[in-house]
Amino acid sequence: MGNTLTCCVSPNASPKLGRRAGSAELYCASDIYEAVSGDAVAVAPAVVEPAELDFGEGEGHHLQHISDREMPEDLALESNPSDHPRASTIFLSKSQTDVREKRKSNHLNHVSPGQLTKKYSSCSTIFLDDSTVSQPNLRTTVKCVTLAIYYHIKNRDANRSLDIFDERSHPLTREKVPEEYFKHDPEHKFIYRFVRTLFSAAQLTAECAIVTLVYLERLLTYAEIDICPTNWKRIVLGAILLASKVWDDQAVWNVDYCQILKDITVEDMNEMERHFLELLQFNINVPASVYAKYYFDLRSLADDNNLNFLFAPLSKERAQNLEAISRLCEDKDLCRAAMRRSFSADNFIGIQRSKAILS
């Protein structure tokens, strides 16, 4: 009535309609803005029929949201170890077959374990290694991650691959690699040498190695491919490239890796990174619970394959440092619990904070 201008839509055209309705709502709003922008009084538009707002088959109205790409609906997230903390990691399950066969062979052949190299704690002495979930040991972590990649290749289900990761179509060196090379699984030491070279040259951290393994298993699950002799180098390179950009707090450029691998081009690196992200559906999030699960599963893998961490007796100084850090965490939990309740300023001031000694 009068100068009041209204726009009527179907009852279902509400903000809860979904993201597909967004384009139509903006289109209707733009018509209103053009109508009221002039000085003359515009005629109120007619009621839009529900048939005109049919978004089911419209091709140009669908705009996928970033959250939809991060959590794909067609994947069972509870069974995907790279997304769900309760799902078992793929590399650990693939390694169990070899571990059981090795133990059975040693039992049948009466192979003695030899001199015990693992140190056990007692009442008077406690042995700890220098690796924690927040600060893993770089050398041991890279060894465990490459061992996990080795089991992925050795116990793969098939040879499903994509052209972008095929080293025969996109070689990493100018020298021609013989076809016989792609018929044999690489040894663990060869994989370790390749990954160690990248980590040493790019100065990457141990946490980046764990995230690399998370992205690798996420790629294999999302894209439904296998890591095999023809694609393992480019898949590992793409996972390291993405993990170094997401995890490490430093500027990493694709050209930096081109200086490490002399014969690869920047265009090839850019294309591989783009395909890697698209296959991950841009889900680069790694929750803390998933990261911790991969860390402890890597420790279990190291223990099963006699890749022991370097243990040392717990000294008094280190015990004090660990106690200070633990007390600091407890005080933070108390502060969070106290903030949930209403209390006076005197009680708030009375909360003590301990100084942590970081080694």
Swiss-Prot record:
It is found in: Cell membrane. Pfam families: Cyclin_N (PF00134). One of its GO terms (cellular component) is plasma membrane. GO terms for molecular function: protein kinase binding. GO terms for biological process: cell differentiation; flagellated sperm motility; nervous system development; regulation of canonical Wnt signaling pathway; regulation of protein phosphorylation; spermatogenesis. SMART domains: CYCLIN. Its main location: membrane. Belongs to the cyclin family. Cyclin Y subfamily. This is Cyclin-Y-like protein 1. It comes from Homo sapiens (Human).
